[in-house]
Amino acid sequence: MQPITVSIEVNVPIQLVWKLWNEPGDIRNWNNISDKWHTPSAQNDLRPGGKLLLIMGLKDGGFSFDFEAVYDEVRTHEFISYTLTEGRRSEIQFTGTNPVTITETFEPNDNDPVAMQRDFCEAVLASFKKYAEKQQDNPSVA
């Protein structure tokens, strides 16, 4: 199956984008596809060989899943790649300094329609953009 690529432009400096993308406390705030979803737990050891573990689910408790990966490559403010425990790979490219374009390319799973997987990723990126741009307006964060 062909990889899926999605991207979004975020009107925030790269230093803040990088922090918000990678800090577990921030990940819990933006990593969702709608107000019905949440990420109640996030662990992130951002280094080659380090682990990323996100627990995502519906707020009503009707469905949840673990998103677990090991980092392959990390280049600060530029690039992240990881391999999921099931063997699929994902790459995230950060381009520009302000605004920043985030481009995520990932291998889709075999169980869900490609369009659904693309829509899910686009919704997460849109949630990140909204969160990041709101944080930029908060002087204690930026």
Predicted regions and their residues:
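Glycine-rich portal/gate segments that line the openings of hydrophobic small-molecule binding cavities
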Residues: 39-83
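Hydrophobic/aromatic beta-strand elements that line small-molecule binding cavities or substrate pockets
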Residues: 6-8, 41-44, 67-72, 89-96
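Glycine-centered tight beta-turn/hairpin loop motif at sheet-sheet or coil-to-beta transitions
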Residues: 1, 62, 85-87
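Hydrophobic ligand-binding cavity/cleft-lining segments
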Residues: 1-37
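Hydrophobic pocket/interface hotspot
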Residues: 17-20, 27, 52-54, 71, ...
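Short, highly charged C-terminal tails/helix-capping segments
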Residues: 131-142
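A short, structured loop/turn motif at beta-sheet edges
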Residues: 13-15, 46-47, 72-77, 93-101
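Beta-strand/loop substructures that line and gate deep hydrophobic ligand-binding cavities in soluble
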Residues: 79-123, 127-130
